[in-house]
Amino acid sequence: MSEAIKDITEIMNILPHRYPFLLVDKILEVVPGEKAVGIKNVTINEPFFQGHFPGRPIMPGVLLLEAMAQVGAVAILTDERYAGKLPMFAGIDGARFRKPVLPGDQVVFEVELLKIKGSLGKARGSGKVNGELVVEAEILFALA
């Protein structure tokens, strides 16, 4: 069953990340153990914009991947089979950055869990701004 998680407090009860590394503002849809759709609202107040890049702020690609992974982690951690686990990056395949993400953008991430076997898993994700693809990748993860 699909549900939304609109309260940041509820997201913080699911994910272990905290400022400045909590990169999910809202979950629009989650099907535990299958998929999640979440939002990152990008503002000029993000700490990474101080150095990336002064005078031309662009959200770092690695943080787009991290935000995507956090949305995927919601799909994992809302499945009672994985409650209390810690999903961690094990690899990234096929990462592509299609357009820069700028202050004022709202990135909508969609992540589908492809498989989980034992403590390892694979997911496919994408991020869009105004319906345009900005990032996509396959994420390999380990559950600790």
UniProtKB/Swiss-Prot annotation:
One Pfam match: FabA
On whether Lyase is a keyword of this UniProt record, the answer is: yes
**What keywords tag this UniProt record?**
Cytoplasm, Lipid A biosynthesis, Lipid biosynthesis, Lipid metabolism, Lyase
Q: Name one GO biological process term.
A: lipid A biosynthetic process
Q: Give EC number(s), comma-separated.
A: 4.2.1.59
GO molecular function list: (3R)-hydroxyacyl-[acyl-carrier-protein] dehydratase activity
Q: Where is the active site?
A: 52
Any one GO cellular component localisation term in the record: membrane
Q: Which CDD domains match?
A: FabZ
Q: Which InterPro entries match?
A: FabA_FabZ, FabZ, HotDog_dom_sf
The superkingdom listed in its UniProt entry is Bacteria
Q: What class of enzyme is it?
A: lyase
Q: Does the keyword Transport apply?
A: no
Compartments reported by the entry: Cytoplasm
Reaction(s) catalysed (UniProt annotation): a (3R)-hydroxyacyl-[ACP] = a (2E)-enoyl-[ACP] + H2O
Q: Which PANTHER family match?
A: 3-HYDROXYACYL-[ACYL-CARRIER-PROTEIN] DEHYDRATASE
Record's function text = Involved in unsaturated fatty acids biosynthesis. Catalyzes the dehydration of short chain beta-hydroxyacyl-ACPs and long chain saturated and unsaturated beta-hydroxyacyl-ACPs.
> What is stated as this protein's family in its record?
Belongs to the thioester dehydratase family. FabZ subfamily.
Name used for this protein in its record: 3-hydroxyacyl-[acyl-carrier-protein] dehydratase FabZ
Q: Which gene encodes it?
A: fabZ
